[in-house]
Amino acid sequence: AQSFRNEQGFRKKKEGWLIKVITYQSEAVLRILKSGQVYRAHKSLSFGKQYGALVDILQLNCESPVFGCLKYHRRCTNGKVSSSVKFLLEVPAEKVKLTEYSVWADFLYAQKFTLAEDYSHVAGLCQELDQETLDKMIHSLQKQKRPWQYRIPQAVLEEIRPEWVIK
């Protein structure tokens, strides 16, 4: 079990470590959580292939991931739009996968150059992307490190549970 002792944004409970995650979601998500139900994202129409690839890479059990950032860490974007609601969550550490934000952004772009049915293979001869670079991106997304080892960590969750919401 990983120890996050002396790292800001982590708290130890008898059940294990909790990580503070900030996420912006719609008001519909707020209603779901207030009703005591678990929120799980539906498959994205726009990014279905990319999100499905990330679900596979991180071995998640969901249709589509829920994204957030870690409190007290650098963030590239906050994900806020005018109609969104900010949630502060305390999530059990084993329920949080982390990726490097810039690698995820590069991977999203790279998917334009992969086979339609296989995110892990470059489609034919491509000047914009070679197989070695794609393999390195996938490996980087898979490899889980301590939060402070990421330049800009992105939190990836399978779901949001009502008991995780602290604000």
Model-found features: residue ranges?
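ADP-ribose/NAD+-binding catalytic cleft of ART/PARP-like enzymes
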Residues: A1-E63
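Generic serine detector
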Residues: S3, S26, S35, S44-S46, ...
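Arginine residue identity/basic-tract feature
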Residues: R5, R11, R31, R40, ...
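Alpha-helical structural elements
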Residues: K12, I19, S46, C62, ...
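Helix N-cap / beta->alpha transition motif
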Residues: W17-V29, L88-E94, R161, K167
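ADP-ribosyltransferase catalytic core
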Residues: Q50-G124
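Active-site and NAD+-binding cores of ADP-ribose-processing enzymes
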Residues: V91-K167
